[in-house]
Amino acid sequence: MVTAAGVAGRSCAEPLVGGKRYAIELGALPAMNDAARRKLYASWMSYLPDDALLSALSIPGTHDAATSTLNLWSKCQSLSLGAQLNAGVRCFDLRPTGTDDLMIYHGTSTGVTFDEAIAAMDRYLAACPSEGCIVQMQRQGDAGNDATFRSRMGDYLNSSSAYRDRFVDFRPDLTLGELCGKILVLTRSDYDGALVGGKIASWQDDVTDQISSIVNGSASAKLFIQDKYGGTTGIDNKKNAIIAYLDKARGKAESEWLFNFTSLATAVVTTPKTN
């Protein structure tokens, strides 16, 4: 359930009436007509107050977000980045390699560079400035090398990107209004030059419950991570990890951040909770 308040000055949705607060229940959405549903998905941030903390929101994201061009085992998504944005996705797991063009890989090349992924977000935000994007980024080791990644990514984020003005720096208390029209890049991999966005201090492999942090200079926030992707321990263990983190999200402090991955490498996870 998402609590929403009327906000003026957003171009992608009508403001709610009289400043009253509303509850949008996801289970009720199928009763809407297709046009209304598409509008809600495409501009759902416009229904929330500007002063809402990002860390207090449940923001939908996609694992290996740029893999719709791939086949079989390397393909994690069936929708392009643009289609994902229209569907309401606002957090993107992108894995560029250490090649000159920062090509995104997942076992093999996706044919999508990091710049092209950012460009897709830029186009969407230009058309719908009530929305904002988060990129969770790490270097993929399938091609290139670490030195090239450090150099090219540092140059891209700090100077050469045509979308430099889109990037916003991390703060624990960053609000939805401050993300509107912007892209927050949270990196797991080091690169040269100044940090743009935020750095995830550590991320253990195949982890069920980790406490890490997101930092930028003196700004720091606690980060909880559930990324248990290995399926060899069974589907029920993954379901339990997801449910535990849904519960943790409800109980954590508003200023604390949390990633709850529902992806699994060797099996399909069905809905963890049913009514």
Residue ranges and their predicted role:
Residues T62, T97, Q138-D142, R188-D190, ...:
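Active-site beta-loop-alpha junctions enriched in small/polar residues
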Residues V2-A87, D100-A127, G132, G193, ...:
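Long, acidic (Asp/Glu-rich), low-complexity accessory segments flanking structured domains
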Residues S80, T113, F167-G177:
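Short, structural beta-strand-to-alpha-helix junction motif
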Residues V89, L94-L102, D142, D146:
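Aromatic-lined carbohydrate-binding surfaces of glycoside hydrolases
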Residues L186-R188, D192-N275:
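C-terminal active-site rim and adjoining tail of enzyme catalytic domains
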Residues R95, V135, V185:
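Conserved, mostly hydrophobic/aromatic
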Residues D115-A162:
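Catalytic cores of phosphodiester-bond-cleaving enzymes
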Residues A87-R90, P129-I134, A162-Y163, L179-I183, ...:
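Loop/turn elements at helix/coil->beta-strand transitions in domains of secreted/extracellular proteins
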